Design a protein with these regions (language model features):
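Hydrophobic anchor at the beta1->P-loop junction of P-loop NTPases
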Residues: 6
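The conserved Walker
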Residues: 10
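Conserved lysine of the Walker
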Residues: 14
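Hydrophobic positions on the alpha1 helix immediately C-terminal to the Walker A/P-loop
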Residues: 17
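Conserved nucleotide-sensing/catalytic segment adjacent to the nucleotide-binding pocket
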Residues: 28-83, 88
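A glycine- and Lys/Arg-enriched "phosphate-lid" helix/loop adjacent to the NTP-binding pocket
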Residues: 88-140
């Protein structure tokens, strides 16, 4: 595993796993959210995002965290040797995302280039990460189920499906 793409619904542990693998294996950590979001939660123009991602993936070894299928998949997947799907159970994933969201709203923790997740925005807005989870969990599951059901479509990728946080920890311990 030298070039890893980690996918999954928001709050599934993609970034945490990518950082841990990068630290343990000496890989460059690339977080697609960091490339996508500019300060003030402004969306980086697609051409700039793709340029930054192309530059980042010139590294010999990396771990990319994030989905962004329409903007990133054609850059990362062909170069990758491993695809990891953080496929966490719905309610466990939602609960952990809720805990993270409350913590970030309370502490003002900075994410994605100095942005914060204010309480009102996360609990009373259509821009809520919780709302995003509700909109995308089933869609992501359908998409990645299809990928993992047809491994012959991605013969260059080792496909790894992690279905629990315990399984993710065990995978990391063995990596």
């Amino acid at each position: 595993m030298k070039r890893i793409v980690i996918v999954g619904t928001t709050g599934s542990g993609k970034t945490t796993l990518a950082k841990a693998l990068a630290d343990k294996m000496g890989l460059v950590h690339i977080d697609l959210d960091d490339l996508h979001h500019m300060p003030g939660w402004k969306e980086r123009p697609a051409d700039d995002f793709r340029r930054l991602l192309t530059e980042a993936t010139r590294a010999e070894n990396w771990a990319v965290a994030g989905n962004y299928a329409g903007k990133a998949q054609d850059i990362t997947w062909p170069q990758a040797d491993t695809l990891i799907w953080c496929d966490m159970p719905y309610w466990i994933n939602f609960w952990r995302l809720l805990e993270r969201t409350v913590r970030r709203a309370y502490t003002g923790e900075m994410v994605c280039n100095g942005n914060t997740e204010p309480f009102f925005k996360q609990f009373y807005s259509k821009d809520s990460i919780l709302w995003w989870f509700l909109k995308t969990w089933h869609k992501n599951r359908k998409k990645y189920n299809a990928v993992f059901a047809n491994p012959q479509d991605y013969p260059h990728l080792k496909l790894i499906r992690l279905r629990s946080y315990k399984q993710a920890r065990e995978f990391l311990d063995k990596a």
